[in-house]
A protein has these predicted regions:
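Positively charged
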Residues: 1-174
Length: 174
């Protein structure tokens, strides 16, 4: 397994729509293992392949408490087939939008069909935080970031701040 670089906003790749995975093989499983290791190291609770520069419809999640055993979940070609009409608000963060957070309203339940790590077709009824995380990560697959749900002013302020941080880091690295 290897750590992958996590892309940060602003980056055009993060706004691309990810492609459907045609075949689950050892290379794809290695990518998912790398994604999981990268997510844990960041640390985070979810990561989409596009966040490491791979435009494939893959997400990894683990919302288990830090002090408990890990519970990694792998979703290939996830598709929300139904959402609740009731909403929950969670403070969302994102590894691609470092240091920023905002309260976002999302359906409190969603039904998702997907392929698992081995390419087996599955369905899950996700509730609460798991539902929020799945929706957040699926948004990534469609080029959407949580900041896109904010007002134009708030979003532009965050992007400006991230751009300044990137430039400062580039100056240090060069």
């Amino acid at each position: 397994m290897a750590l992958r670089q996590i892309l940060t906003e602003p980056n055009k790749i993060l706004r691309e729509k990810s492609l459907f995975v045609e075949k689950v093989d050892e290379d794809l499983q290695k990518l998912m293992d790398d994604m999981l290791e990268t997510m844990y190291a960041a640390p985070g609770i979810g990561l989409a392949a596009i966040q490491v520069g791979i435009p494939k419809r893959i997400i990894v999640l683990d919302i288990a408490p830090k002090e408990g055993p890990r519970n990694p979940m792998f979703f290939i070609n996830p598709e929300i087939i139904e959402k609740s009409e009731n909403y929950l608000t969670y403070e969302e963060r994102c590894l691609s939008v470092p240091g920023q957070f905002a309260e976002i309203d999302r359906p409190d339940k969603c039904y998702v069909k997907y392929l698992d790590y081995h390419g087996q077709a599955k369905e899950i009824k996700a509730e609460g935080m798991l539902a929020t995380c799945i929706q957040h990560e699926i948004d990534h697959l469609d080029g959407i970031l949580f900041i896109d749900y904010l007002s134009k002013l708030k979003k532009s302020m965050i992007i400006k701040k991230l751009s300044k941080q990137k430039k400062a880091i580039e100056r240090i690295v060069v």
